[in-house]
């Protein structure tokens, strides 16, 4: 559902079926942003985020958690402490998702990159 929304909004979406696959793909083809649920198979979204933020190749990639995970309700700061840049509770609308993503990726596109 989210992939369809994002594709319709003009984003190039790559999907992973579990946390390890997402991590491997991010290392090989670093995305502009990682959008993840916190409750995913394999390594969960918390561990996925910690590993992404702990690796030099992917530490600068923003992570948006979109979740209805029960632990989020009892401790909303847990995802942020794991390294998520933002958290969006489910259910969310297509507009809410797009706005959250653009808030995270647009500042990156404005950064001045040093000459190589």
What are these regions (language model features)?
Residues 15, 40-43:
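Residue-level signal for the "D+5" position in two-component response regulator receiver
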Residues 15-33:
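Acidic, metal-coordinating helix/loop segments flanking the phosphotransfer/catalytic sites
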Residues 92-101:
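C-terminal output helix
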């Amino acid at each position: 559902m989210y992939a369809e929304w994002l594709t319709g909004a003009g984003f190039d979406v790559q999907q992973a079926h579990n946390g390890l696959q997402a991590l491997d793909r991010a290392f090989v083809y670093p995305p502009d942003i990682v959008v993840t649920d916190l409750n995913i198979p394999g390594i969960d979204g918390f561990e996925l985020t910690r590993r992404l933020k702990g690796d030099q190749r992917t530490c600068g990639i923003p992570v948006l958690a979109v979740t209805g995970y029960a632990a989020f309700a009892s401790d909303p700061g847990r995802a942020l402490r794991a390294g998520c840049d933002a958290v969006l509770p489910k259910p969310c609308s297509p507009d809410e998702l797009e706005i959250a993503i653009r808030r995270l990726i647009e500042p990156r596109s404005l950064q001045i990159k040093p000459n190589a």
